[in-house]
């Protein structure tokens, strides 16, 4: 299945907003990748990067602690999925849309080089009090994807047959993973 939108978030601080957006966007006909509802067993990392590659829009849910691990030099960057997802989306030229949650007024200016470009991206400010206005603005002004009239689901067998190709370092995902995990 090809996705229009990938949602990236921290489980603590961003899950509720991410899940709410996922439900609304799906109901409106967008094909949305949301890890908990749409990923199955297998190579989790490869499947995530493949989905980012397929999508046009990358929504980044930013709570007040979203970038704490990213700027912590003691934290293993290979275990920081938000950073890995964001770095890959930026490297692939995706339409990155940061959604700033309550308590976040701007993105930090001390981000690592692989994700620093996110500070140049614009997105709607999320407010619970004016959620409908936020959602309308997100869909009408920031998303490049258009809703699909028909949502199709592929079976796991079809998806699995192509997974071996994503392990090869000659593909974009393979090269990115190889670069990401090589020792420094």
Task: Name the predicted role of every residue range.
Residues 1-64, 90-92, 133-141, 146, ...:
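Conserved N-terminal substructure of TIR/SEFIR domains
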Residues 40-43, 64-94, 104-108:
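Conserved TIR/SEFIR loop-to-helix hotspot centered on a Trp-containing motif
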Residues 47-50, 75-77, 112-114:
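Short low-complexity, flexible loop/linker segments enriched in glycine and/or proline
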Residues 11, 102-105:
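Short glycine-enriched loops at secondary-structure junctions
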Residues 109-124:
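Von Willebrand factor A/integrin I-like adhesion domains
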Residues 45, 79-83, 128-135:
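Amphipathic alpha-helical transducer elements in NTP-driven molecular machines
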Residues 96-100:
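Conserved beta-strand/loop subsegment of P-loop NTPase cores
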């Amino acid at each position: 299945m090809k996705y229009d939108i990938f949602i990236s978030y921290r489980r603590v601080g961003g899950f509720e907003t991410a899940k709410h957006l996922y439900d609304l966007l799906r109901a409106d006909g967008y094909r949305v990748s949301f890890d908990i509802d749409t990923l199955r067993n297998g190579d989790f990392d490869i499947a995530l990067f493949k989905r980012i590659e397929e999508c046009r829009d990358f929504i980044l849910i930013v709570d007040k602690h979203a970038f704490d691990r990213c700027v912590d030099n003691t934290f293993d960057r290979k275990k920081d999925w938000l950073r890995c997802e964001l770095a890959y989306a930026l490297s692939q030229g995706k339409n990155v849309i940061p959604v700033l949650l309550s308590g976040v007024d701007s993105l930090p200016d001390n981000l690592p080089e692989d994700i620093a470009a996110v500070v140049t991206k614009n997105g709607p400010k999320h407010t619970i009090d004016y959620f409908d206005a936020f959602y309308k603005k997100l869909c009408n002004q920031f998303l490049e994807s258009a809703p699909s009239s028909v949502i199709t689901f592929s079976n796991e067998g079809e998806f699995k047959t192509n997974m071996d190709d994503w392990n090869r370092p000659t593909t974009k995902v393979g090269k990115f993973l190889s670069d990401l995990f090589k020792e420094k």
